[in-house]
Design a protein with these regions (language model features):
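Glycine-rich, basic loop-to-helix element that forms the pyrophosphate-binding segment
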Residues: 77-100
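Short aromatic/hydrophobic "clamp" motif used to bind/position activated sugar donors
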Residues: 105
Length: 312
C-alpha cells in the first residue's frame, strides 16, 4: 500500500454491517483492508475508517494495518445505539471526507472486498470528466440468502457493466472528484448520502458514470434471514425519507400510492436484468422466493419513509 501525505486517492471505508446490530465488529472489515493493502500499482493513497464507540476489534486492526487512519466519531446525531438505523453511516462518511486529502475520494463498505486493481482502475477512470464514477459489484458467498440480498442490492452492478455515463452509482463502490464534492458541500456537510449528493451534482450539470474495471466482491458471511429482512426495512425507509428531500409533495404521495406494487415490479425488473447479463440467472431463479420476501420488507419501509418523511 503506497500511503502518502500527498494522496491522490483517499478511500473511506464505512462499517455498514451494523445496520441491525447495536454492536459492530471488524470481521468483515479485515478482508476489505487486507485487499487494499495488496493493491497492484497503487497510486499515492490513504485509507480512512470512521467508526463509533461500539465497534469491537479496532485496536487489533491498528496493529495489523498501522497506515490506516481509524477515526473515532463520538458525536453522531443519527446513531440510535440500539441498531435499526443506517443514517449514522452518512455522518461517518461526512466526517471522514472532511479529513481526506486526496483529489479523488473513494467510498467502500466493510463487506466489499476490492479487486487488487481497484485503486489503479479508479484513478484511471477519473481521467475522464465525470464527477462521480461507480464500479461493478459481484457476490462471492454462494448461499441462496446471499444471492437474494445481492440481487436486491446490486444485481444491476453485476458485470458486464457498460462503461460510460449512468444515471446511478452504488454508494458501496463509488468515487468522486474532490472538486465536484466541494462544489456541492452543503449536500453532505451533515451527512453524505449518495441520493442527495448525486442529485446535487446532476443539478449542476455534472455527470455520473460506471466502470466495469472498478470491481468489488460482496462477502457477507453469516447472513441470517431475520436480520436481512430488518435491514431491508431500515434501508427502504431511509431511501424513502431521503427521496422526500428532493421531490415535490404530489410526487411523494404518488410514490406512496404505488409502493405496494413495488415488490412485484422490482422483482420483474431484477429478473430481466439477470437474464440480460447472461450470468447467474439460475441463482436468481433459485433465490427468487427470498428476493420477493426481501423486496416486500424494503417496500414496506419505503412506503413509511414517504408517509413519515423520517428514517427508521
Amino acid at each position: 500500500m503506497q500511503f502518502s501525505e500527498n494522496a491522490l486517492l483517499s478511500i473511506i471505508v464505512v462499517i455498514a454491517s451494523d445496520t441491525t446490530e447495536p454492536q459492530a465488529n471488524v470481521s468483515l472489515l479485515t478482508g476489505c483492508l487486507d485487499a487494499l493493502s495488496r493493491q497492484v500499482n497503487p497510486p499515492p493513497m490513504e485509507v480512512i475508517v470512521p467508526y463509533h464507540q461500539r465497534v469491537v476489534g479496532i485496536d487489533s486492526l491498528r496493529g495489523r494495518f498501522p497506515q490506516v487512519d481509524f477515526v473515532l466519531v463520538n458525536d453522531l446525531k443519527a446513531w440510535s445505539r440500539a441498531g435499526g438505523s443506517r443514517e449514522h453511516h452518512d455522518e461517518l462518511k461526512s466526517v471522514a471526507l472532511k479529513k481526506a486529502r486526496g483529489q479523488i475520494i473513494g467510498f467502500l463498505e466493510d463487506n466489499e472486498v476490492p479487486d487488487l486493481n481497484w485503486c489503479a482502475a479508479t484513478v484511471d477512470a477519473h481521467k475522464k470528466e465525470y464527477a462521480g464514477i461507480g464500479g461493478a459489484i459481484e457476490n462471492k458467498v454462494d448461499r441462496l440468502l446471499n444471492w437474494a440480498v445481492y440481487f436486491c442490492d446490486f444485481g444491476r452492478y453485476q458485470n458486464p457493466v457498460i462503461d460510460g455515463e449512468s444515471a446511478f452509482a452504488s454508494d458501496a463502490n463509488v468515487s468522486y472528484k474532490r472538486s465536484a464534492l466541494e462544489a456541492v458541500r452543503p449536500s453532505w456537510e451533515e451527512g453524505l448520502n449518495e441520493v442527495t449528493v448525486n442529485a446535487a451534482l446532476t443539478s449542476r450539470g455534472e455527470k455520473l458514470a460506471l466502470s466495469a474495471e472498478m470491481v468489488v466482491y460482496q462477502q457477507r458471511h453469516g447472513l441470517r434471514l431475520g436480520p436481512a429482512l430488518r435491514e431491508r426495512y431500515v434501508w427502504g425507509r431511509s431511501f424513502g425519507a431521503v427521496r422526500c428531500q428532493v421531490m415535490s409533495f404530489p410526487a411523494r404521495l404518488a410514490l406512496a400510492a404505488v409502493s405496494p406494487l413495488l415488490p412485484g415490479l422490482v422483482a420483474l425488473k431484477l429478473g430481466m436484468t439477470a437474464w440480460r447479463k447472461r450470468r447467474n440467472f439460475s441463482k436468481f431463479v433459485q433465490a427468487f422466493p427470498l428476493v420477493l420476501l426481501l423486496l416486500m420488507g424494503w417496500g414496506f419501509g419505503e412506503l413509511l419513509g414517504y408517509l413519515t418523511r423520517r428514517p427508521a
